[in-house]
């Protein structure tokens, strides 16, 4: 609600100011608007709460703030409060004519307009901190542009069939492009890769002919060669293409981006015309090297983005890196060049993924032997001229642009996305919002450029910052532009006509508690080298650096200082009978932390609400009394222990006792309790562990033996079922089976008496083992 109200409030000011009705009617209208919107009653009135001591500092707080320059303006009978929103200043008795409130102006000169595609060509904007300005930018595409089309072809061996197709594209393409342009020109250039290892073979037999292994006559590899400047002579173009030979390299990626940058920036060599639509057609079937790839060849010098053609050959190919995508995009946009990637094979998607990073580019897939090349160029051109996008160049520090495109079909899109399907009869509008957040920006440029991508016209936006007041310039006698309650005579200087601050004499560093800390702890403003702290509804902010307050103390159960104390400088000052960092503990609770020696937590902790919290992590116990590894007082003063029994001591030792050990004579006491837990006999512990281990082992052996005996007993019982007994008279007939004898032992084998008559077995029953 507050944001929309403020926007409406500011917009009304701008409109009224542009009507030039004078300051009185303007500020009276501002007062009415602020009363209606209730801004004067808002909880977050940063104007009044800031304690701004000058008009400039007041206006820098936000677009709703005004400054009263009236000399006798007094609020509350104590001191001047000149910074507030307009409605409050008027209600406090400040006359309308005495209120400083610079408005936002957008000035569009109508005379001397030379642009035909982008209007207005120039805009002048006056801004104040926190305010924003709006204007409309119109872009109207022309019907028949002059067109410059430059073919940049990958002439590696795999592109042989596509290069042959170029011999016949000239006339056919000229006829098709005549529908879109009355003035069409063609140019040609070739590229391969950097002529160093590992990109090409440097073998003596292959250095000049990379195709020698295939019995082909190839031209030497090269980074980029400009073959033919842009010309209307189609026959000359076809002859240049016909003379072109293929070349070769080793690795798969090519040096396309290197060649593209040179073709873009070498304007005079290529013959780019300022008034023409510039198209760069890149034909390839492989990816391109990116920045840093050339480090593999020991090339570490970054690409400088300049033209380096000598005799139409790129001479820095082996000494400078490939350009980055960002650098390439910048050079293409700066030179108004649209790129068409004509890619054959599976690498088409690689280039398609790059389109969002290269504004004004299109990718198309060419068929075998480039049969669809002309149609691809025509379709790409139609798409390019039907898209209208803008971007901001030459950004001004501290100034922010928000651009929305209003397309012919009524849809709204972000400026970088732009509009599509725009015809030569359409007009695209761009709603431009310019915002300045603060005034503490010095130096730099004071204008920005809004550039439609691919167009040769731009809009220049001049920015003027309203960061000072008229009273500080020439109107104000003493007291109008400043609040003297914050200042001293060394900083605040006035003459008969005006007052000003000698801010160079007082550095803001004096308002910092430390060089890494914000000015006035971020809770005040630095005026004449002193902090003026903000007024906050939560409480009082004070201190030399506004570092103290009476509201940021810790809470306990929802109450500041548990309700048992007051907050001073961020620390709780407890009432009588209470203690603790939050005043949450009764003072009597401290008695529960005193040990038998009268020490609080044995000197190794702090008492928190009747319980010891050991500060030494080695201490344990209710009173932190146990600390096996602590360095005890006896150890620290062991050399002085003999002073407690001075008999038979030498004079030197007695002198030492009187000096370094004198304090101990007054404070010593005998501690009869052990610092450590009582330690049992190690030998006894050893024998106990040994006996227990032995008994456990013996028990395991007995259990295992019993299990084995039980298992054997069960097996003997089961074998008794197979006893065989026979009388001497009986005859046992053996079956024709083969058996093996198995011998095993047991503790008490049971005898088995068997009487088996012998039989003569037939040979067929004999067993062979």
From Swiss-Prot:
Entry binding sites for Mg(2+): 154, 156, 254
SUPFAM superfamilies: EGF/Laminin, Integrin domains, Plexin repeat, vWA-like
Protein's membrane topology: Single-pass type I membrane protein
Residue ranges of domain I-EGF in the record: 471-495, 499-547, 548-584, 585-625
One GO CC term on file: extracellular exosome
Cystine crosslinks: 47-65, 55-469, 58-83, 68-94, 211-218, 266-307, 407-419, 439-467, 471-491, 471-494, 481-494, 499-528, 511-526, 520-531, 533-546, 553-567, 561-572, 574-583, 585-609, 593-607, 601-612, 614-624, 627-630, 634-661, 640-657
Any single Pfam family the record assigns to this protein: EGF_Teneurin
PROSITE patterns for this protein: EGF_1, EGF_2, I_EGF_1, I_EGF_2
Gene Ontology MF, one: extracellular matrix protein binding
Domain comment quoted from the record: The VWFA domain (or beta I domain) contains two cation-binding sites: the ligand-associated metal ion-binding site (LIMBS or SyMBS) and the metal ion-dependent adhesion site (MIDAS). Unlike in the other beta integrins, the cation-binding site adjacent MIDAS site (ADMIDAS) in ITGB8 is not functional due to the presence of two Asn residues instead of 2 Asp residues. This domain is also part of the ligand-binding site.
Family statement: Belongs to the integrin beta chain family.
Name of the protein this chain belongs to: Integrin beta-8
